Amino acid sequence: MQGPHLSPLVLLLATMGAVLQPEAVENLATNTRGLIFLEDELWPPSSPPEPLCLVTVRGEGNTSRASLRVVGGLNSYEYAFLEAVQESRWGPQDLATFGVCSTDSQATLPALQRLGAWLGETGEQQLLVLHLAEVIWEPELLLKFQEPPPGGASRWEQALLVLYPGPGPQVTVTGTGLRGTQNLCPTRDTRYLVLTVDFPAGAWSGSGLILTLQPSREGATLSIDQLQAFLFGSDSRCFTRMTPTLVVLPPAEPSPQPAHGQLDTMPFPQPGLSLEPEALPHSADPFLETLTRLVRALRGPLTQASNTQLALDPGALASFPQGLVNLSDPAALGRLLDWEEPLLLLLSPAAATEREPMPLHGPASAPWAAGLQRRVAVELQAAASELRDLPGLPPTAPPLLARLLALCPNDSRSSGDPLRALLLLKALQGLRAEWHGREGRGRTGRSAGTGTDGPCALRELSVDLRAERSVLIPETYQANNCQGACAWPQSDRNPRYGNHVVLLLKMQARGAALGRLPCCVPTAYAGKLLISLSEERISAHHVPNMVATECGCV
């Protein structure tokens, strides 16, 4: 490659807030030149059905680069492709690396150059990297890729089909979805072959990409074996085949237009530290508004802001443990502090009918004991300190937390509403529990037999596929399993409970004899990409219902 060597990159992956322990991050970083990525076995049970990684590339000075959204995991050769694009200066040697014909006028080179420039910029744009879900060799070569997240790529109109080739001739490629006829000119220095795809949605939602490869030599054809060896290059380090990738490019930014013979330019505004990507409805209480922003920052941004006020379902609320809490009673507040379960406070009907949310006020003459208020202040500071030390904390969280603490009394002599400190403490306890749940246990502590105590919930279970001789990749994967007790009240917070099991659990709690006790079983599954060998051919298939993602009692 020409040009200076790229500074060490760090890729930080998060899946719905999944966080690596600092020790694990340090160990991985020392072995991968600063690249950190999660293998399939490391996905926590709380991951979405198709794991979605948010990859942030950081350069020197910890400067944020473009973020990538990856469906599945980012393989080492896929990361190497992105690094090669960013390092390229597009001289003859770089053109040979990507198999670009020197006399070719196709759109592949401009698309590669745009991708390289985009990878070197800062910003909030996102790039989708989709993995192969299925390949069919006869009667036509057909490639179908995994679906992106809902709404994630509907407005994107161009993609790069990246091949990691083995030995092969120069070919002319035609097919559905491609931008006209395209040429591939591999040499001994070629590591990647790239095709430009217009309107790539058909690669996952339609019939797939149908390709026809015609060697440049007159009368030559490629057999299926030659085609497989050419398009699915061998990874000598892992003794596997490297499958194609679909890199969906972000929309091009509008270019400045010239006026009166001169080029008028206007710089894009620098991204500022916004407390929330979407504006929140105005609140009469700055404390409640800031607390809402903190919760949203830690739980992840909403896909689309909505001002719709949702009504609570009385039937759903009836299934939760209920009780009256006198907020003027120090003993009741003390019991509330000892309980770290999520808390739902309902206002009176009169307050609920107000047009504006009512400010939070504590009772003016509440008999708050000095010891109780000191305990709230101490536990609040401890919870805030623990929250600040969480790895992977969003940068918007610390200033929001500092503002909330400033609005709360920190001892019995401080001014401020003591109920604010209590509400903030309960919120931090819930966020801390959810964040730790996303972290999960370390790899060394994982086993199929752990975690049987407690309510029905998703547990980690690794399945060995080496006994299935036809499966080449993966050798092991995280299948998960459901374990735990089914009891009333349900405490695994699964929204898929039916009335039937609710009645059974209530009967069981009353001591009624049941012929069959409710069982903890999977209620939702996700698929898995398997690469198998059949009749001396390698094929990739997306097999459904391979990974348990939710549990419930039935």
From Swiss-Prot:
Residues with glycosylation annotation: N62, N326, N410
Changes after translation: Preproprotein is proteolytically processed to generate N- and C-terminal cleavage products that homodimerize and associate to form a biologically active non-covalent complex. Binding of the non-covalent complex to AMHRII induces dissociation of the pro-region from the mature C-terminal dimer. The N-terminal portion of the protein, despite having no intrinsic activity, has the role of amplifying the activity of the C-terminus.
Feature type site, description Cleavage: R446, S447
Any one Gene Ontology cellular component term annotated for this protein: cytoplasm
Signal peptide residues on this chain, from the entry's feature table: 1-24
Intracellular or extracellular location(s): Secreted
UniProt note: phenotype after gene disruption: Homozygous null mutant males have a complete male reproductive tract and functional sperm, but also uterus and oviducts. Most are infertile due to female organs blocking sperm transfer. Females are fertile with enlarged ovaries and atypical follicles. Furthemore in the absence of AMH, follicle growth is more sensitive to stimulation by FSH.
Propeptide position ranges: 25-446
Domain of life of the organism encoding this protein: Eukaryota
Similarity comment text for this entry: Belongs to the TGF-beta family.
Subunit and partners: Homodimer; disulfide-linked.
Its job: Plays an important role in several reproductive functions, including Muellerian duct regression during male fetal sexua,l differentiation and in the adult plays a role in Leydig cell differentiation and function. In female acts as a negative regulator of the primordial to primary follicle transition and decreases FSH sensitivity of growing follicles. Binds to its sole type II receptor, AMHR2 that recruits type I receptors ACVR1 and BMPR1A which subsequently activates the Smad pathway.
UniProt protein name: Muellerian-inhibiting factor
Organism name: Mus musculus (Mouse)
